[in-house]
């Protein structure tokens, strides 16, 4: 199964949260195909005052994912989502790009913030800590 992993889960892994550690181990072992959006990559790298050792560990961790850049199709999809959901549901541009990444790649979105995404048609957003993956 292809899954786009949201920032919150990566942060949990770095903090040693058991569910996140288990999930990323499944990706590393190939049980799940892990994708990461450019937005998540940016959010992770924006952590303040990261030591060289921590930065090295983060880069190694991010290496288990297939990186999904924001290409034209993703940008167009995100724009359509914003047009449809920004006013009615408060969809933020970064969340629109993450949702678009999942939709364009026909992947499930793994996030701890399902409320940010549950209303988007054609997107499956799951809290992997609550679900049997």
Labelled PLM ranges:
Residues 66-115:
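Active-site neighborhoods of divalent-metal-dependent phosphate/nucleic-acid chemistry enzymes
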Residues 8-9, 39, 73, 115:
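Alpha-helix/helix-capping structural signal
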Residues 6, 12, 43, 95, ...:
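Acidic active-site catalytic centers that drive phospho-/nucleotidyl reactions
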Residues 10-11, 42-45, 118, 126:
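Nucleotide phosphate-binding site architecture
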Residues 20, 41, 55-58, 75-78, ...:
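A general structural signal for well-ordered alpha-helical segments in protein cores
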Residues 61-63, 120-121:
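Short, structured coil segments at secondary-structure junctions
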Residues 1-36, 46-60, 132-133:
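Short, well-structured N-terminal submotif of metal-dependent ribonuclease cores
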Residues 1-2, 104-133:
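Acidic, PIN/NYN-like endoribonuclease modules and their adjacent C-terminal/linker elements
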């Amino acid at each position: 199964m292809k899954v786009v992993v949201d920032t919150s889960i990566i942060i949990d892994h770095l903090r040693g949260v058991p569910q996140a550690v288990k999930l990323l181990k499944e990706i590393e072992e190939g049980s799940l195909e892990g994708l990461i959006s450019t937005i998540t990559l940016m959010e992770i790298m924006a952590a303040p005052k990261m030591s060289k050792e921590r930065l090295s560990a983060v880069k190694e961790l991010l290496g288990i994912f297939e990186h999904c850049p924001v290409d034209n199709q993703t940008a167009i999809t995100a724009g359509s989502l914003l047009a449809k959901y920004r006013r009615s549901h408060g969809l933020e541009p970064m969340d629109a790009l993450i949702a678009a990444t999942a939709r364009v790649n026909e992947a499930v979105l793994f996030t701890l913030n399902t409320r940010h995404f549950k209303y988007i048609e054609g997107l499956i957003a799951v809290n992997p800590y609550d679900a049997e993956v």
